[in-house]
Amino acid sequence: METLKGLPVANAINEKIIEEMKDWKGAIPHLAIVRVGERPDDMSYERGATKKMEKVGFRCTSYTFPADIDNDTFLKAFEKVKVLADELVAEGSYHPTYFEMLFLMGMVIFADAGVDYVTLETGLGGRMDATTAVENPVACVITSISLDHMQYLGDTVAKIAGEKAGIIVPGVPVIYDGNDPDAAEVIRARAEELGSPAYEVKRSDTEVLRNTSAGIDFAFRNEYYKDMVFSIPFIAKYQVMNSALALKTIEVLQNVISVSMDQIHVGIAGTRWQGRMETVLPGVIVDGAHNEDGVEKFVETAEHFQKECPLTLLFSAVDDKDYTDMIHTICSRITFRHVVVTSVGGYRQVPAERFAKLFTEAGASSVEVVEDVEKAFGRALEVKGDDGMLFCVGSLYLVGEIKDVIRRNKK
């Protein structure tokens, strides 16, 4: 059995459970799967690829989390997988981990639903991930790589890329973000070693033509797409790379997936990703950025818009995130009309006064503490006015509570 920092990993479940699952409507061998290694900030790749294939008429689904599965379906899948898990334990093996159980349940649900294509996002993301149990994906995609999950994946981009490259399958095409030279070198070498065709996508392959609060128009310049212009409903420029990776995947799979350019345009324009630079009201953007790379991408976007209108910030974070560095990064490059801070996260919450002190020390000129999230959001909207933009940043807990407030107020 292989382990990762002492934890049992997916390879131990491959033989017995996967063989058993082959009898369940061919759950593993007959689903057409696009395996994706990505970070939370890049999940729009998965959404974009899925949306394009849905527009062609395929039944598609995504493996990210079980939020969209009804309770009965979820329970039936659990009971089916638990039988096999109990057999493993009885034979002296280990019980599948929480994430391995979810993966196996996902495969059962997808097979029973009769989907045509699955975009399968890795969990931790690579060599030791439960999703590597799938042996025959139609493509493997690796989005941008940064220093994340370092305690498990390594302390350099190259080491993390080595783990991410573990999703590559011999002979199966791999499409990857080639902007970081260290990561790109590792991915290329692994693809060559396995005889897998490798397709690199870089920022220089794209050109942003328009970037407004309504979205982005961009060109993806290559022989297949020529100088076509695509529109995406995102305001963050990093989403252009994710969209380009999805477009490249469709191109590489053109002999597998029959799709017209019109369908591609409609699919990419209809892509949505909740909680990541998501416009929830006119001029109001929520972003669950909570790590170094996510905050950097938020700042890049806010820098663009601060040239056009005054910005207001609603901020909160939980205690296991490096919120001090987050605040310093934000304040070093963005000037806000007003900053409202609040507390989220239950037992992990940080007193809002702590955030206020840090923002003031970092140079923010107007900072206000509002402990109640709903009241904090209302106050931030009031300050935003008709002429500005409001960014709600720092935690997915904050994003969730704000979206809940908006839903309640619509009733």
Give the location of each predicted region.
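Nucleotide phosphate-binding/pyrophosphate-handling subdomain across enzymes
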Residues: Y117-L120, M128-V141, I145-D148, K159, ...
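Acidic, Mg2+-coordinating active-site environments of NTP-dependent enzymes
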Residues: L88-V89, G114-E121, P137, I142-V229, ...
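Positively charged, low-complexity intrinsically disordered leader regions
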Residues: M1-A27, Q151
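ATP-dependent carboxylate-amine ligase catalytic core
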Residues: A67-E135
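Short internal beta-strands
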Residues: I33-R35, Y63, P173-G178, L313-F315, ...
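Glycine-rich phosphate/diphosphate-binding loop of Rossmann-like nucleotide-binding domains
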Residues: V36-K55
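C-terminal helical cap/extension that packs against the catalytic core
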Residues: D180-R190, G195, G283-V284, I327-M389
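Short beta-strand elements in bilobed, periplasmic/extracellular small-molecule ligand-binding domains
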Residues: M53-P66, S366-E368
